[in-house]
Amino acid sequence: LDLGCGEGRHTLSAALTAPIHAVGLDMSRRDLTTARNRCGDFESLTKTENAPSLIEGDGARLPFADATFDRIICSEVLEHIHDYETFLREIRRVIKPGGLFAASVPSFFPEWVCWKLSDAYHEVEGGHVRIFNARALERSISNFGFERFESHRAHTLHSPYWWLRCLFWRGEQAQHPIVNLYHRLLVWDLMKKPWLTRWIDRLLNPILGKSVVFYFSTDP
């Protein structure tokens, strides 16, 4: 289950990578339509047995039976939710005994800088409602019967991009030329994966990584 799947990046990636049944759930009908259209870009995902299920729904009331999923991810979602512990309770309910859960949220320092640079960044509809403290979030998740076995920071190069977005805030309108230029760098890095940016990412992730990622297990 990819909870809060948006336009399906992780859902489709999982379906393409392994022989699994991937399920993406999101509240945005528009994002789910985009995700379905993206499935058409991959021949293997047009086959019924490989196609992911993309469902419109609320993470606070998941439309699944108890102990349904072997793996659950919730990537960059919890920071948007006022009552995020309700999401965690539902995740615990629908994950199987022995299942694995991965969650990511914005890291404290890069997110704090974004909030300082632009009020609009977090005041937009559907925007971020809190800045998580990583240890506090880990405790919250652990309180629902999960045990963390790994965590790391990621996406150092994304932090300056969002700082520039906030500094030259234009919402969803055409971005400042500097922001567009940096975005081109990110796309190039994603496609080419040069050793230099990989090295910079590994070096600076502990300090500037835009996201913190947790991996949890449950008792068998």
What are these regions (language model features)?
Residues F146-T156:
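Conserved S-adenosyl-L-methionine
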Residues P106-R130, E138-S140:
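Short, glycine-/aromatic-enriched active-site segment of Class I SAM-dependent methyltransferases
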Residues R130-I131, F214:
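Short glycine- and hydrophobic/aromatic-rich loop-to-beta-strand nucleating segment
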Residues K116, H158-P220:
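A C-terminal cap/extension of S-adenosyl-L-methionine-dependent methyltransferases
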Residues I81, I131, P206-I207:
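Short, solvent-exposed loop/helix junctions and linker helices
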Residues G40-F42, D119-H122, C166-R170:
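Short, hinge-like loop/turn segments at secondary-structure boundaries
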Residues L1-C114, A136, F214-S217:
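Conserved SAM-binding loop
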